[in-house]
Regions:
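Active-site core of metal-dependent hydrolases
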Residues: 1-55
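Charged helix-capping and loop-helix junction motifs
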Residues: 57-65
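Short acidic/histidine-rich active-site segments
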Residues: 1-2, 67-87
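Mid-to-C-terminal alpha-helical segments outside catalytic/metal-binding sites
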Residues: 90, 100-131
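Short acidic (Asp/Glu) and glycine-rich catalytic loops that position anionic groups and cofactors
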Residues: 16, 43-45, 70-75, 88-93
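Short beta-alpha connecting loops at secondary-structure transitions
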Residues: 47-53, 75-77, 93-98
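C-terminal helical cap(s) of enzyme catalytic domains, especially alpha/beta-barrels
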Residues: 32, 88-100
């Protein structure tokens, strides 16, 4: 809700956050989406976790594709695999089946994840070569 968007805004503006875990409620706050886009702040999206914690009513209604289409940088994540019993392949399957994600979409999210990682540029280049 509005509090969540405000927290994302404050994390970016006051704490200089470069990545935000979850943060999907900014879909209803255009200025915060603009801020993420402008400052290149990446949202770490966890579709199944967002559904299981009632942040979204179903995985099919998850706003990830709308966030991407708006230009908000996002990555695909599995949150806590041991708690939720899922892995990244599970998230990919859901996004492909329910949101029409293509190989190009997954590639873009993986590129974003590599770029947004906190490792140095040399290590990023090595990791990306192996993807």
């Amino acid at each position: 809700g509005p509090e969540s968007s405000r927290e994302v805004h404050d994390a970016i503006e006051l704490l200089n956050a470069e990545r935000i875990g979850h943060g999907i409620h900014i879909i209803n706050d255009v200025p915060v989406m603009d801020l993420c886009q402008e400052k290149n702040v990446t949202l770490e999206i966890c579709p199944t976790s967002n559904w299981l914690t009632s942040a979204v009513p179903t995985t099919a209604k998850h706003p990830i594709k709308r966030l991407m289409n708006y230009g908000v940088p996002v990555t695909i994540n599995s949150d806590d695999p041991s708690l939720f019993g899922i892995d990244l392949c599970h998230e990919y399957e859901i996004l492909h089946r329910e949101h029409g994600f293509t190989e190009k979409d997954f590639h873009a999210c993986n590129q974003r994840a590599a770029n947004a990682s906190f490792i140095d540029a040399t290590e990023k280049a090595r990791v990306w070569r192996n993807l």
